[in-house]
Amino acid sequence: MYESYINKIEDVGKLRNLKPGTIRTYQNNIKDFLKFINKHPNELTCEDARDFLLYLKNKVNKASTLNNKNGALVFFYKRVLGKLWDDNLVPRAINDYAIPRVLSRSEVERLLDATPNLKYKAMFALMYSAGLRISEVIHLNYDDISRTNMQI
């Protein structure tokens, strides 16, 4: 229905060097928003965006999902429509941070004992003892380790 606006999201996104996945996400989020609000984009207000996010919140969406939609709306309003955005009227949701579950010493020992490959055993031990993520261990270089201080 408003395909020219959806196409403009792609054009502006490319100019701003957004990744193709981000552009597609923005387009899909704005399509959902326009279907929900059922107004011409030139008539949109921040209250419309707020109503949409409240609707999604009432459908028990997570804060990260709401913030994803909010980001698409901000981009659409400011960059595509050239409208002002009121962060006070349409605030970002506060993330629900989950406390990570930490393995017990016996669970770590069982993991290491169950890993026959010495390389992976060393990686798991390093991840656990230094609190590193998988990507941090994978990208670790020889020069990242201070052998005199025994520190990473």
Where are the predicted features?
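Conserved catalytic core of the tyrosine transesterase superfamily
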Residues: M1-I152
